[in-house]
C-alpha cells in the first residue's frame, strides 16, 4: 500500500495487533537514520522499553527512535517542501457547508457536540501527535485549499492547484465530505511527484486479502453444505455461490478469489459472478448503483444462487450493498449473504442501512472490533481526549488517519527526509498491538511487507434486533454484529475447519463490558497537555 490510505467512506483508521518486532532491535543507531529500536532509542525517557514504543496512550504508537539535539544538522532542504525548520503539507478541504453537513470522517467539535470543520480537525489532530512524535527539528506546517468540485475536471484542476505549491505531502480531507478530492485527485497528485504521496490503494489491492480470507473460510466451512442461513426459498438447497464485486480497470481481481476458493472445492456458478461499475465522481455513484441493481440481482437469482459472496462496498454518500439488498427484496429473493469485510459492510453503523430482511441472513468475517461499554473501544477518541480532554478540540477518525500516517513516516524516516526514506519508513512500520482479541492488519500502518498483506478477522452474524453502540465507533442504533468465540480473530491459514455456530445467541457476544486486560495500553501521563492543565488552545477557539 505504497504510502496510501483508504479513500472510501468513513476512513476509520485502526492498526492491528501482532507482537512488535523491530528489525535490528538494540543495535547502534546509524548517522542520519532514526535509530529505530537502537540502544539509544530504548533508553529515551519517551520510550517504554517493555514495548519498544513511545509512551503514547494508543496501541498504534510508533517504535522508539534515537535522541535528537535541537541544534543538530538534519540536512536542511532534503526534499521538495522540506527545510531545516519545516515540512510543508497542503490540505484539500471541502466547502464549509458540505463539511458541516457531512458525517463522513466523523468530524466532531467536542466543545459544541456538533459537526466540526476539517481544517480544525487537521490542526487539533496534529497537536496530539506533535506533542509526542520526534520530527527531527522540523515542524509540520499546513496550508489549506478549498476543493472546487467533485467531478473529474474539478479533481484534476484541484490537483494542479495543490501541486503548484510544492508541498512535501498533500492530504485529501475533501473526499470525506464528498466535497471534492477522491481517486482522480489523489492519482494526479501522486503522478505530479509530490514526495509524500503515492496513488490511493486500488480496489484490486484493497480486496486481495479479503478474497483470500473468504476463500479459505468459505471453502472450509460452507462448501458442500446447505444454505441453512438463507430464506425459506433457499435454506434446504445445496449451496450455489455467486459473487458481487466492483469491476473495471481499477476493480477487484476476481481470479484471486476463484483460484483460492477452488483449492477447497468451491466454485462460482456459471454466470453468477457479477460486477458493477463505480463512477469516479462520488455524487454520481448512487444513481449508478440504482441503475445497475435490478439486472445484477436478477442475474444472480436466475443463476440459482443461494449464497452471495458480497464484495460490494458501503458508505454514507453511496451505498452499493444497501442498494443491492433493497433490490433483492423487491425481487422476492432471500439468499445467504456472506460478509467479506469489504469497506464498510462489517461496521454496524453502515449495515443498519441495508435491507434488514436481507441482512438478517448475513454472516461471515468482520474486521472491526466489538463495541465496549462506555465507548472505550474507540481508541482514537481515547487518544484525542488523552491530550485535549473531553470538552475541547475537533476530532475526526478520518482526518487522524492522514495526519497519523504523515507523522509515522516523518518520525521513522529520520532526519534525512525524502520521498524514498519516507516510503521506506512506512514499509518497515510494524503492525501494531492490542485491539481486543488479537486484531491484526497492516493495511493501515503504511506499506505492507508483502504484495498481499495480513488481515485478521473475527467471525460474526447480523442480529437485526440487537441494540447498542456500533462496533468500533459507538454510534447507537438497532442492529449489530454478533461475534462468535468471544470475538476471537483468525489469520489466513488458521480459520476453523468446521462450520461455526452462526445465529446462535447463546454462543455469541454483541459487545464487551470492558477492554480485556491484555489489550490495555499504558497508562501513560500526558505531560503539559490541555487535559492536564497545559495552555494549548484548539483551532476552533482561534
Language model features: what each stretch is:
Residues 18-36:
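C-terminal region of N-terminal signal peptides and the immediate post-cleavage residues
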Residues 35-76, 80, 431-542:
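Solvent-exposed, acidic/polar segments of extracytosolic/periplasmic ligand-binding ectodomains
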Residues 327-402, 412-413, 505, 510:
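Extracellular/periplasmic periplasmic-binding protein-like sensory domains
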Residues 31-161:
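N-terminal extracellular/periplasmic Venus flytrap/periplasmic-binding protein-like
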Amino acid at each position: 500500500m505504497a504510502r496510501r490510505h483508504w479513500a472510501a467512506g468513513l476512513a476509520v483508521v485502526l492498526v492491528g495487533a501482532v507482537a512488535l518486532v523491530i528489525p535490528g532491535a538494540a543495535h547502534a543507531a546509524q548517522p542520519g537514520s532514526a535509530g529505530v529500536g537502537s540502544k539509544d532509542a530504548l533508553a529515551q525517557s519517551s520510550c517504554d522499553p517493555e514495548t519498544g514504543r513511545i509512551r503514547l496512550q494508543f496501541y498504534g504508537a510508533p517504535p522508539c527512535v534515537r535522541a535528537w539535539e535541537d541544534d543538530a544538522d538534519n540536512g536542511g532542504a532534503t526534499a521538495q517542501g522540506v527545510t531545516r525548520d519545516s515540512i510543508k503539507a497542503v490540505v484539500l478541504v471541502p466547502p464549509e457547508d458540505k463539511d458541516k453537513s457531512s458525517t463522513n470522517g466523523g468530524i466532531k467539535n467536542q466543545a459544541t457536540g456538533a459537526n466540526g470543520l476539517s481544517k480544525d480537525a487537521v490542526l487539533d489532530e496534529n497537536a496530539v501527535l506533535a506533542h509526542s512524535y520526534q520530527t527531527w527539528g522540523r515542524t509540520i506546517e499546513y496550508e489549506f485549499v478549498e476543493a472546487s468540485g467533485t467531478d473529474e475536471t474539478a479533481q484534476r484542476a484541484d490537483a494542479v492547484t495543490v501541486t503548484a505549491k510544492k508541498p512535501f505531502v498533500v492530504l485529501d480531507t475533501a473526499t470525506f465530505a464528498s466535497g471534492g478530492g477522491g481517486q482522480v485527485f489523489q492519482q494526479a497528485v501522486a503522478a505530479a511527484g509530490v514526495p509524500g504521496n503515492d496513488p490511493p490503494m486500488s480496489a484490486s489491492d484493497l480486496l486481495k486479502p479479503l478474497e483470500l480470507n473468504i476463500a479459505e473460510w468459505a471453502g472450509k466451512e460452507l462448501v458442500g453444505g446447505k444454505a441453512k442461513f438463507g430464506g425459506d426459498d433457499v435454506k434446504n438447497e445445496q449451496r450455489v455461490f455467486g459473487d458481487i464485486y466492483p469491476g473495471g480497470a481499477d476493480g477487484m481481481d476476481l481470479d484471486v478469489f476463484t483460484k483460492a476458493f477452488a483449492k477447497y472445492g468451491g466454485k462460482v456458478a456459471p454466470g453468477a459472478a457479477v460486477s458493477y461499475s463505480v463512477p469516479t465522481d462520488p455524487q454520481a455513484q448512487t444513481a449508478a448503483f440504482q441503475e445497475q441493481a435490478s439486472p445484477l440481482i436478477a442475474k444472480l437469482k436466475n443463476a440459482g444462487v443461494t449464497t452471495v459472496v458480497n464484495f460490494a462496498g458501503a458508505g454514507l454518500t453511496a451505498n452499493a450493498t444497501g442498494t443491492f439488498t433493497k433490490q433483492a427484496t423487491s425481487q422476492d429473493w432471500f439468499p445467504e449473504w456472506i460478509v467479506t469485510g469489504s469497506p464498510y459492510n462489517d461496521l454496524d453503523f453502515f449495515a443498519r442501512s441495508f435491507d434488514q430482511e436481507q441482512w438478517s441472513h448475513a454472516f461471515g468475517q468482520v474486521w472491526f472490533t466489538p463495541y465496549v461499554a462506555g465507548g472505550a473501544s474507540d481508541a482514537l477518541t481515547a487518544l484525542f481526549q488523552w491530550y485535549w480532554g473531553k470538552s475541547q478540540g475537533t476530532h475526526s477518525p478520518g482526518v487522524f488517519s492522514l495526519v497519523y500516517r504523515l507523522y509515522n513516516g516523518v518520525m521513522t524516516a529520520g532526519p534525512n527526509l525524502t520521498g524514498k526514506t519516507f516510503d521506506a519508513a512506512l514499509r518497515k512500520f510494524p503492525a501494531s498491538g492490542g485491539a481486543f482479541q488479537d486484531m491484526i492488519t497492516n493495511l493501515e500502518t503504511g506499506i505492507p511487507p508483502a504484495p498481499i498483506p495480513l488481515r485478521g478477522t473475527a467471525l460474526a452474524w447480523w442480529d437485526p434486533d440487537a441494540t447498542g453502540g456500533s462496533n468500533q465507533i459507538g454510534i447507537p442504533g438497532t442492529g449489530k454484529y454478533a461475534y462468535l468465540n468471544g470475538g476471537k480473530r483468525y489469520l489466513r491459514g488458521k480459520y476453523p475447519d468446521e462450520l461455526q455456530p452462526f445465529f446462535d445467541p447463546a454462543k455469541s457476544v454483541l459487545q464487551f463490558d470492558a477492554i480485556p486486560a491484555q489489550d490495555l495500553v499504558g497508562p501513560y501521563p500526558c505531560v503539559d497537555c490541555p487535559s492536564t492543565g497545559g495552555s494549548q488552545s484548539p483551532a476552533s477557539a482561534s
